[in-house]
A protein has these predicted regions:
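Beta-strand-enriched accessory nucleic-acid recognition/scaffold domains that flank the catalytic cores
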Residues: 48-60, 78
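Low-complexity, highly charged intrinsically disordered N-terminal segments
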Residues: 66-68
Length: 240
């Protein structure tokens, strides 16, 4: 008998994501490459044409009613777990809708990392319950423009976590620490909401990227028109 060769169960291929020092360099346009893309997307999101479209999509997502539904036939077995999940969703320091609204920022930047902050459910910890179970304290957004780099494991096949610049509030201002301190957040500690899973890119792909050239031409044309109108108003200079 011919022996059957052993089959490798793990992944042999690579995702093919191009990186340099933890920074993703897939994009050839420097305006759309990290970290400059954050400034580009912020400017685009304020455009009078783009802003209404972004707000419409984000408000539509935020207005969707969220509920816990037990699969048919498992009502009795999962009744207690479903009730616990409902309690967790409504026992945070902020509302569930606030979390959804922040998570929709992936529609602008392509990704939205959200940290999972836990606490034991005691009233002294701010919980509505006093049973000692582990629940959620909050689901804060890890601001996209504070992500300094990504780290991988398994030879680059799986995401290990992200590094975040430590931005500490100082009075009425938010200033970055002088030491450029970074905080590593492991992947198990946050949820990563992405617009595209291509190449397992943690930054996803912003929908604004596809309209960048049209927006660039539009803004340049508006500047040229404004310059022309300004020249017409001032009239022609006459030398005496």
């Amino acid at each position: 008998d011919i022996p059957i060769p052993r089959l490798k169960l793990g992944q042999s291929s690579f995702n093919g994501l191009w990186t340099a020092a933890g920074t993703i360099v897939e994009e050839c346009n420097s305006e759309l490459r990290w970290p400059q893309c954050m400034h580009t997307y912020k400017k685009m999101a304020k455009d009078a044409t783009i802003a209404p479209a972004l707000n419409l999509v984000e408000m539509a997502i935020a207005r969707v009613p969220w509920s816990v539904k037990i699969p048919e036939g498992y009502e009795e077995q999962l009744k207690d777990k479903a009730e616990f999940l409902r309690q967790v969703m409504n026992d945070m320091d902020h509302s569930w809708g606030s979390f959804i609204r922040q998570a929709t920022s992936f529609n602008r930047f392509g990704f939205a990392p959200v940290e999972k902050v836990y606490r034991k459910r005691y009233k002294k910890n701010g919980s509505k319950f006093d049973d000692g179970l582990v629940g959620l304290k909050s689901l804060p957004l890890i601001a996209q423009d504070t992500v300094s780099s990504w780290e991988w494991q398994e030879g680059g096949r799986e995401l290990a976590g992200l590094n975040q610049y430590a931005v500490e509030p100082n009075g009425k201002r938010g200033v970055m620490t002088s030491s450029w301190k970074e905080e590593f957040i492991p992947v198990k500690k946050f949820m990563l909401i992405r617009n595209s899973p291509l190449k397992n890119n943690p930054e996803g792909e912003s929908p604004l990227k596809s309209v960048y050239m049209a927006w660039k031409y539009k803004t340049n044309l508006e500047e040229f028109q404004a310059t022309g109108v300004s020249s017409d108003v001032r009239g022609l200079k006459v030398l005496y």
